[in-house]
């Protein structure tokens, strides 16, 4: 039976993923995390893993990413999606995420992360992850 837990006093509820912003939800160990595709997250992933986001998307499509790489990717997108007052999520550990991904299942998690990475390389969002305005045609 599912328990409906309310946030403790002084803590806000976790934000929900907004697909209009290209966000997705990743559930690890029963906790839902918002994955938000921002330029800051993309730059952190590229710097940490030493490759372009496009190359990482290609590797994801070939199921060629390690657990640690998946933890790094998930961590950057989770930190980008953290609520401003959620210091615990904002400081989430990539190695701990890799362990949780191992427990959850690499293929399941890879599908979700691949969708968010595809949103990064396909564009249509501001660096902060908001949808870009569409110009009206005359």
Predicted regions and their residues:
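Charged interaction scaffolds used for protein-protein
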Residues: 1-32, 51-65, 84-138
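Short, surface-exposed, low-complexity cationic segments
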Residues: 39-57
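Short, hydrophobic/amphipathic alpha-helical patches that form generic packing surfaces
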Residues: 69-80, 115-118
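Short capping micro-motif at the N-terminus of alpha-helices
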Residues: 35-37
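Amphipathic alpha-helical interface surfaces
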Residues: 41, 66-74, 109
């Amino acid at each position: 039976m599912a328990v409906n837990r309310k946030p403790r006093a002084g803590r806000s509820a976790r934000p929900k993923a907004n697909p209009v912003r290209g966000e997705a939800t990743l559930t690890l160990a029963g906790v839902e995390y918002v994955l938000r595709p921002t330029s800051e997250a993309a730059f952190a992933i590229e710097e940490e893993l030493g490759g372009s986001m496009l190359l990482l998307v290609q590797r994801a499509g070939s199921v060629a990413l390690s657990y640690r790489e998946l933890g790094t990717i998930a961590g950057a997108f989770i930190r980008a999606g953290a609520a401003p007052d959620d210091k615990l999520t904002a400081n989430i550990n990539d190695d701990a995420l890799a362990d949780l991904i191992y427990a959850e299942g690499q293929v399941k998690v890879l599908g979700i992360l691949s969708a968010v990475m595809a949103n990064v390389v396909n564009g249509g969002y501001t660096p902060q992850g908001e949808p870009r305005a569409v110009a009206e045609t005359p």
